[in-house]
């Protein structure tokens, strides 16, 4: 996607904002950079279809470290061997295979082809510090619809044995590994390319304010270049950040959910109400045990809202402030699809029937969260693009020295980041369907390679896994709010202080 010239002013060096370390500085960035893959593998293995979620031996540490009487193993070796067996450890060489590599590269290639071939909206981004605006091509929603229509057709023909679903379930850990490698490689690539950015360049390339501290690992994590782009033969110029923000990972998140739903159906012959995330569309052709509640609107609503509102990312912190480094690369390609789908993975092995009352409660939470999330963001987007629109013309605001307007009434008069409240409430509906999570699997002779699922002694043991998203997301949103507050305080100065006196609450009115 070419950079616009019509709106570009003469590119001049921009004055850099004072910017301190974030995320714990170089030490924090280092720990996060090498700790995140470990966390992803931990979630992938600890909630499994071999022994349980979590592995039962973890609930009895004394037994775990006590070898049998005739064993010549030391305690730690016995513990490692036991855990390896219980989590289905494939060995180091088994963490990756050719099938997964080819599948992932096909997925990224398909995403690029749909981006360039399907009709798209071409819009300009916000004005850069150095002047001018970049052009963006948006068709993520149409791309997703194309993909899911194809998957629906395949599922109608093949049912839960549709090749996409079986491929994902057969290679889950290997797919995780390949995406981790791509995330690291991409972060290294954009870091090295960022040193080509020169002050006063005519290509509208600029460094992120917080991404060139001089500390290699910290800058690699935060991202040195604000909007790195790459020219691919037969594809053209691709904005790496905006492309990775929604396509491979967000659409992949829903694909993982659907694959896990297919796995549950193949294993049990039905899909419980707790798993109703698009599954009626794709698997409804088969005979199902349908519960009173038809659909729990959850993760797919969030994803398709983001895809439909794709141009709105142009004014987010990710696009306007953060560089593209390991933080966004790993988050977009690995963390979002593989961690956010953990509840569906859990339910694929341990079906949970919620019942009408619990379904109604979760639907209410989801609907409330979505209403707050969408209403607040709509007000903000409309006000930014057309402040005279009748929907927002009555709202009061403070005008800053930079020309920006800060809303002080309506939704945005209740809290400075009220949209985060809706975002967090929606996260509840992803986790609550797992109830008091925890199960174990016991081999049975009824069928070959079959296991019985039970919750005996396991109820609640899986909560740290299936409810992790709620806690993590709360921390993420509070941390993001603090970062945004610091940025706005630097940018708006006294006007921001005045704004905070009028709009006192940060996220939750009356509480925080």
Curated annotation (Swiss-Prot):
Pathway as given in its UniProt record: Steroid biosynthesis; zymosterol biosynthesis; zymosterol from lanosterol: step 2/6
InterPro entries in UniProt: ERG24_DHCR-like, Sterol_reductase_CS
A GO cellular component entry from the record: endoplasmic reticulum membrane
Documented EC number(s): 1.3.1.70
Entry binding sites for NADP(+): 380, 384, 407, 412, 419-420, 484, 488-492, 499
Membrane topology recorded in Swiss-Prot or TrEMBL: Multi-pass membrane protein
Disulfide bond residue pairs: none
GO molecular function: Delta14-sterol reductase activity; NADP binding
Catalytic activity line of the entry: 4,4-dimethyl-5alpha-cholesta-8,24-dien-3beta-ol + NADP(+) = 4,4-dimethyl-5alpha-cholesta-8,14,24-trien-3beta-ol + NADPH + H(+)
Pfam entry (one): ERG4_ERG24
Transmembrane intervals: 27-47, 100-120, 140-160, 172-192, 242-262, 278-298, 324-344, 353-373, 418-438, 458-478
Cellular location(s): Membrane
Family (UniProt): Belongs to the ERG4/ERG24 family.
Protein's name in the database: Delta(14)-sterol reductase
The species this protein was found in: Septoria lycopersici
